[in-house]
Amino acid sequence: MIYLVSNQAELFKSDRYSKISVEKSLEIMDSWKVVQLDTETEGLDVYTKRLLTVQFGTRDIQIVVDCTSVDILQYKSFLESNRVFLGWNLLFDLKFLYHHNIYPNNIYDGMLAEKLIWLGYPAGMKGMSLKDTAFRYLGIDIDKTIRGKINQTGLTEDVIVYAAGDVQPLEDIKDAQEKEIQAQELETAVSFENEFVKCLAYIEYCGVRLDVPRWKAKMENDLERLNKAEKALNDWVVSYYKEHLHDPDSTNTLEVEVDFCLEERVGSKVIKHAIEYKTYTPIEAPRTVTGPDYVSYLKQKLKVVFPFVKINLQGDLFSGFDTEPKCCINWSSSKQVIPLFELLGFNLITFDKVTKKKKKSVDAKIIKAQLDVSPIAALYLDYQGASKVVSTYGQNWLNAINPVTGRIHANFYQLGADTARLSCGGGTANVNVQNLPHDPETRACFIPEDGNDWISADYQGQESRIIASVSNDTAMLDLFINGCGDVHSLVAKMAYSHVIGDTPIEEIKEKFPQYRQEAKGIEFAVNYGGDANTIMNNKGIPLSEAKAIYENFMRGFPGVAKYQDYCRREVMKKGYILLNPVTKHRAHVYDFEELDRIQKKFDDSEFWDYYREMKKYDPSCETVKDVQNYFRRKSASEKQSINYRIQNRGAMMFKLASIKLFNYLKKNNLLGVVKYCIPVHDEINLECPKAMSEEISKILVKCMEQGAKPFCTRLPLGADVSVGEHWIH
């Protein structure tokens, strides 16, 4: 049965539903303990689009409230009661309710529950929409065609019936989900995430203020840095060309003469590009290529070189007769950069994560490991960094400013990673406030409203303390509890023991700053499941040196080594990663059944005989592919079993701190007074009136410390707080 609550007496007359008053609707719902909830709106932005309807329902009764004629505040007491409200993607609905000063207490978000059930599965493998889930559990097909027309049609008879239909299956879906939730012991995880979504909706609703003049000045500086970086690259290529390829008096080169003359038609004008080489010394031919064959080999190689530099021999009256060589590479095109870097001796071969095949790449990670190959590497990395800043942190941020609030309201994804970590980006704002550069120029652009202070608080060495706690490593625990707490110096001492020797940890930062800096990368790599190969690739050092560093690390931190071995064993035994023992979030090895099927064949010696034969004669056969896929996925899952547990604990303490903070603000009527501006994994940024910033700072630190306790049990984890006129950290 569908009921409509509307003050538009002459509109929406239909035999598909009955019209009732607000009072009658509240009377009908008075006995409901569990209420299915949904909204329909004019659009996605709570500040510029209207709330059209709010729907309440059970399996048998649905009530649609016409919010264009009925004040939704008449349902405030009902919505803020202790009833449980079931919804789907309640992050969206809560913001529209918050806009009307309505803050529900008890909610169950079916979409969050579904994501927790399938955490670890690749995006798209299991649909998370209400339509997909209703079909998966109930076998019903929800018609969503009306939803796409609401923005154009507004409230109509079809929209009212559609809105009622959206709340009808929610309780049946919840009942079906609970069987799986109980089987996976996810009850606490579901409850936890349902608490956090209320805070996350408030974060999105608050948004953050951007200092527009300062941002525009930053954009100009960023563009200037990019232009300088591009000029440095162009100058280097031309200089290299002159030194190695264009100097007829060079005595260090083989006397091989190769001439090219290219003609390029631009409109009615013909430009001639002449390249004259005496030789190209960096090219090393295979040892078997000598004499005349070397000349031929060199010519073939030089065909790759000449597009990088052009000379305008013809000129014109307007641009003059500048015959100086000019670099013609588009540095933003990897296709144009790769041939040059290959010619200079860089190894650009990597593996495509999607296709699992070899490919060539000039990504920063690859070039950074080969800084000693050529000076152009550092110049190109500078260019890449400057280019990313210009393209990612420019006009798009100004475009994201809401015309009503003057603030940026970013979109967040509560379970944006398999670790249950929060992620940001996309949506109406399409900017990522969690991935902003750390430089003071950028951070200073984020400011509070006039009369407010900005408050930043971040955990003290969060990851290192979590690792010490979960691994129960005595060296790390002793450092944090009884020592100076400088874990980077401790890692340097363990990894580079042959250099640092018996130097006290307190003195390493001053005496061995380079090794302490190197230790940060080693600590990050190993703590997240990396090995000697990871260190070798990240630092561009020989494997033997990387192995020595890795072995020293593991000897120095036996607790970490033991803990990682345990993680690796458990994941391939259970088929999932227990992310933490408190909430019992888990990330599945999505293809575990297939991997287990393959692994069971390994005990058969005949299988390996067949595998070796097929690998030699038919490497594309199913058996060879199965073995390769097994060990690739096993390696990835084992690394994740180490990495995910650490990241999840960090995410959980951040979420718990945020829940505690939100509840405090709500209890003390400070919602809207204290704004939650930016969450960044281990950092919380607020703004509040100056008169209360000292008090709120203390409350924030207390919430963060309390949030950390259940997930970092063997040592305290505090937070540093700063108060200022803009984002400080």
Segments predicted by a language model, with ranges:
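Active-site-proximal helix-loop-helix substrate-binding element of RNase H-like nuclease domains
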Residues: I2-Y17, D45-Q182, V190-L200, H488-Y496, ...
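Mixed-charge, glycine-rich, non-catalytic linkers/tails in nucleic-acid processing enzymes
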Residues: P104-I107, D143, G148-L317, C328, ...
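Polymerase palm active-site segment centered on the conserved acidic dipeptide of motif C
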Residues: E171, A217-E255, D259, F553-R569, ...
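Catalytic palm subdomain of template-directed nucleic-acid polymerases
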Residues: I117-L119, E171, Y202-L226, I467, ...
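Acidic, glycine-rich two-metal-ion catalytic cores of nucleic acid-processing enzymes
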Residues: F12-S14, T39-T41, K49-R50, Q55-R59, ...
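Short hydrophobic beta-strand that contains or immediately precedes a catalytic carboxylate
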Residues: V35-D38, I107-Y108, L210, W454-D458
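Core structural elements
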Residues: I140, Y162-D175, A183-L210, D259, ...
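N-terminal accessory regions of nucleic-acid-interacting proteins
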Residues: M1-T39
